[in-house]
């Protein structure tokens, strides 16, 4: 029973990411960073940054950085992870979780961004699904990039991002590694 629900959930949450690139910049020598968005549940767009080496050969491994409460794609650890792993020859995607960065419609700061009222019976089911779907769609987006080897995509989570990643790893079989702290 649970395995059939799990397979159905994975199938329903996986669809074309309809990604759009916006602008690229070079934060440090040898690393290119692109501001991109990718699609997720209910037509929402997820703002993200993709870091990659300026020059490379062949397909590269990729890493998704999952941020926690009060963290977004510009957090120091997201930036540092992007630079570090891109310099090491990988592709890194870090994004704004729901309620953070560009997805903080009420412009609250820190964890107060999550104080939006959602009816209690629906909150856990809706929010956890949306948050996990952001990770799953990040995998879909990276799998479509020409420089990424889809068989070598992993993820790391910080703080609340580590909890989100542990749930995503349970349902997203395309993630080859998960690391949380």
Feature-to-residue mapping (PLM):
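Glycine-rich His-Gly loop
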Residues: 40-42, 65-70, 159
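N-terminal pre-domain segments of enzymes
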Residues: 1-17
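Cap/lid segment of the alpha/beta-hydrolase catalytic domain
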Residues: 58-59, 64-144
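N-terminal cap/lid segment of alpha/beta-hydrolase-fold proteins
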Residues: 16-58
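Short alpha-helical segments and helix-capping/turn motifs at coil-helix boundaries
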Residues: 33, 76-80, 163
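Short, flexible micro-motifs
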Residues: 46, 71, 102-104, 160, ...
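Primarily recognizes the serine-hydrolase "nucleophile elbow" in alpha/beta-hydrolase
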Residues: 88, 137-181
């Amino acid at each position: 029973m649970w395995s059939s629900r799990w397979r159905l959930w994975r199938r329903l949450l996986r669809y074309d990411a309809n990604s759009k690139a916006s602008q690229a910049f070079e934060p440090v020598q040898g690393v290119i960073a692109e501001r991109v968005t990718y699609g997720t549940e209910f037509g929402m767009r997820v703002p993200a940054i993709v870091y990659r080496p300026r020059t490379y050969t062949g397909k590269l491994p990729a890493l998704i950085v999952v941020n926690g409460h009060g963290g977004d794609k510009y957090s120091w650890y997201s930036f540092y992870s992007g630079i570090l792993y891109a310099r090491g020859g990988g592709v890194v995607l870090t994004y704004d979780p729901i309620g953070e960065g560009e997805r903080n419609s009420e412009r609250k700061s820190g964890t107060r961004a999550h104080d939006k009222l959602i009816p209690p019976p629906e909150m856990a089911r809706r929010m956890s699904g949306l948050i996990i779907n952001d990770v799953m769609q990040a995998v879909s987006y990276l799998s479509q990039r020409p420089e990424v080897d889809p068989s070598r995509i992993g993820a790391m989570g910080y703080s609340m991002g580590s909890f989100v990643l542990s749930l995503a790893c349970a349902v997203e079989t395309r993630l080859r590694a998960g690391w949380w702290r």
